[in-house]
């Protein structure tokens, strides 16, 4: 190769390397990001981009992160990127600091952040290290703390919620009222309570049959089997004062301590009150072909106990196709599993606006009598299927002015207890209600059935109830049902299983064999032609 060509090659190589270096430097200063996720999980929401308009004075966000953790985990880098992007669109209203508190943890600890233990390996030696990772949002003399942050999954929701809480200097209070005798907040609703606390709400236990304070922003009524008219009167009084409520109720009570024996819920309790608001819950059970597989402990034939997995149509997996695409609660539907739901119908009252949130599939059916819910009752599950197959409503919302259920007639009484307050008006101010016809879907059973998106549904409903609609889309896009159970129809599932066997065990091996035979035939033909050519040349 001539000297001029070699010189040109060297020059071209040097210029190429220089261009790569300059491109790398430029990418640290100017960059863009393409979000290919279906839920736009890595794109700032409209609520976050417009947050500057809600901030009167500058907000300071401090991310306390130990360098030892940042060097070993990808989460902190993603968190810092998110905070910097939020700072960039805030028009100077948000200032972000990144602080390593390892040497001087006093500032972090003054905000309530505590060190977390992490196993690290250095020079072939394993040890426990104390690391910090948490975010503090400061506004004037107030602050909100987000502890133990290690991913961006729900960070945008938590940051926006914390900023708004700092500005307003108040966390919304969510009252939790357990309405079943066998359940309590401490033993059965910790997943929900913890989720509410993490989402920026202050959970507060409400005892049945007591007045609900004015500072409660929304009320969860969790179950209704142990609530009578006296208890319902206090809930009605809360709504008549403009309170918002989420009702998780049932028409049939299931006793898990007695072989899942099912009995209708007393009609004189909460259900008549809901009926006066336009929600009729039948004393029946809805079963659906879209359901969960549930492990039951049953008696083994040879004695002792065994775990039996049962396709359990009483635990209904709601299909996204049968949810409202317009209501913010379900517009970004992540999943919802209902345990022993009852059918619901709507009977509009006054000027109240109702919206159907979720329905079963079109192949659901009912148990209207002779309830059979135990694993030993499988042959009885579908006795009424032929006569009751159809689609049934299981969740709905309503907003408007509701008539008081106690405006007419004498107020209920209870011996030894003070009388409930009489309605101050015959109808409520403008308010909102959510009703789901399953009382148990928000219990801690959701963790056992891998249905923790139930809690996300309840939190989205809370945001809708307190009119924080723009936060719902942020929360919902971080929660996805990842279970491989999309095919609900039993016949379709069976057909696809057979088709999979045919393809993997039949067609694929035959294709490989056919390809091999074809290659062998081509090779033999080429060898024959080659021998013919060599013979002719000879």
Segments from the language model and where they lie:
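Extended, charge-rich low-complexity interaction segments
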Residues: 120-143, 311-329, 501-504
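A cross-taxonomic marker for long C-terminal extensions/tails that follow the last structured domain
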Residues: 133, 142, 149, 334-343, ...
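Conserved GHKL (Bergerat-fold) ATPase module
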Residues: 154, 184-187, 265, 531, ...
